[in-house]
Regions:
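Extended, well-ordered protein cores
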Residues: 2-382
């Protein structure tokens, strides 16, 4: 539901505040369920604090652009849904929090049997209050090749309801009244968070044998179909120095990916990401014990957004890298890959002035402290 912020009264909690609270509730739940994620958050905050202490200019810049307070907050999470009715209802749930679907991603092109969108705030004020977004994928059961498994998957999904009656009632109330009171907002966040919690018991009717068959067909299918609900797949905080995070994760007991994905650190564009590898968790399939591997912790370092011209150059350079050096699964050529990546991206201007001059990136402009001192004064010359 799209809510008019101007219609909000003092008796209602704003959708932006509800989203910010929901993000914190999700973070607390995930820290409890996946202790390694709590360790990751502590590391991110330690690194960000060190970077800001060592770079007063960066701290001042972030203070002026209203970004400092939310540096270490989670930027996004990811979930996987099983049927269209779940997507329809989750859109209403996110709508209460001012989140709208943005973009469409057909992941079948990457041999993943889902298509996806991202739910987030779409205006500057909302993003400033809470940038949290949820990447939401929907299973395409028609792409399950085995007819027997496909029919069983559809049967299991048809039987489940991932939304509680109180949550449905609160969504309907928010849509009807135009918002939620403080008490209702608290109940809403509690019920909404339950949708994404981990269940150590598989869905009714899922045996260990069936789970293995689903997993062998596609791990994503098993992750969606064989559980009672769409447990959060990962959460992603933001760091100011991802290479330090990458180096320090093993020191704190986390099994980090072999390389940081994205452009090299010498080229501050787009997004760089890394994560600790998905954990193996115990699951009960009726009377049998089993395991499931899906959930992990991710980190991102955000830089300049690219124009179409900039994105074209980025894609060309990355394709050149992958044609020559592909990262191996065991990490044995990580140093070679990173060196070739850094060398290749020297063709991309690494400084903001060069990017702006060549029309490669987007920029926002803010009044500096010096400019504010002269606010309201006519220029001496034009």
């Amino acid at each position: 539901v799209k809510q008019d912020k101007s219609a909000m009264t003092k008796s209602f909690i704003s959708p932006d505040d509800t989203r910010a609270r929901f993000s914190r509730a999700m973070s607390e739940m995930y820290r409890t369920e996946v202790p390694a994620y709590g360790t990751l958050l502590d590391l991110v905050r330690d690194v960000n604090d060190r970077v800001l202490a060592a770079d007063p200019a960066l701290r001042k810049q972030l203070e002026e652009t209203d970004n400092l307070e939310r540096i270490s907050e989670e930027r996004h999470g990811a979930i996987r849904l099983g049927k269209a009715s779940e997507l329809q209802m989750i859109a209403r749930v996110f709508g209460v929090m001012g989140m709208q679907p943005v973009g469409y991603y057909d992941l079948t092109q990457a041999n993943v049997p889902v298509h996806s969108t991202a739910f987030r705030a779409v205006d500057g004020e909302g993003l400033s209050r809470s940038p949290f977004r949820v990447f939401c994928s929907l299973l395409r059961t028609e792409l399950i090749k085995d007819q027997g498994l496909r029919e069983k998957a559809e049967e299991l999904l048809a039987a489940r309801d991932i939304f509680s009656d109180p949550l449905r009632s609160l969504v309907e109330k928010a849509e009807k009244d135009g918002g939620l009171s403080e008490a209702d907002a608290r109940r809403f966040i509690t019920e909404a968070t339950k949708v994404f919690q981990w269940h150590s018991d598989a869905a009714p009717g899922v045996s260990k044998e069936l789970y293995i068959q689903m997993r062998d067909a596609d791990p994503r299918v098993a992750d969606i179909v064989c559980f009672k609900g769409p447990h959060i797949n990962h959460l992603t905080p933001r760091t100011l120095e991802i290479d330090t995070i990458q180096a320090d994760m093993p020191k704190r007991g986390m099994n980090a990916k072999n390389v940081v994905e994205g452009p090299p650190g010498s080229c501050p564009i787009l997004l760089r990401q890394t994560s600790f590898r998905a954990l193996t968790e115990k699951v009960r399939f009726g009377g049998e014990e089993g395991e499931h591997t899906a959930r992990f912790g991710e980190i991102e370092q955000r830089s300049a957004a690219l124009t179409p011209k900039g994105r074209q150059l980025y894609d060309q350079l990355l394709a050149r890298v992958l044609e020559n050096v592909k990262p191996k699964a065991d990490g044995s050529n990580a140093a070679e890959y990173n060196a070739f990546l850094d060398q290749t991206f020297r063709a991309f201007p690494a400084d903001p002035a060069g990017m702006r001059r060549e029309g490669l990136a987007y920029f926002q402009y803010y009044v500096t402290e010096k400019g504010r001192k002269h606010q309201g004064q006519a220029p001496a010359s034009l």
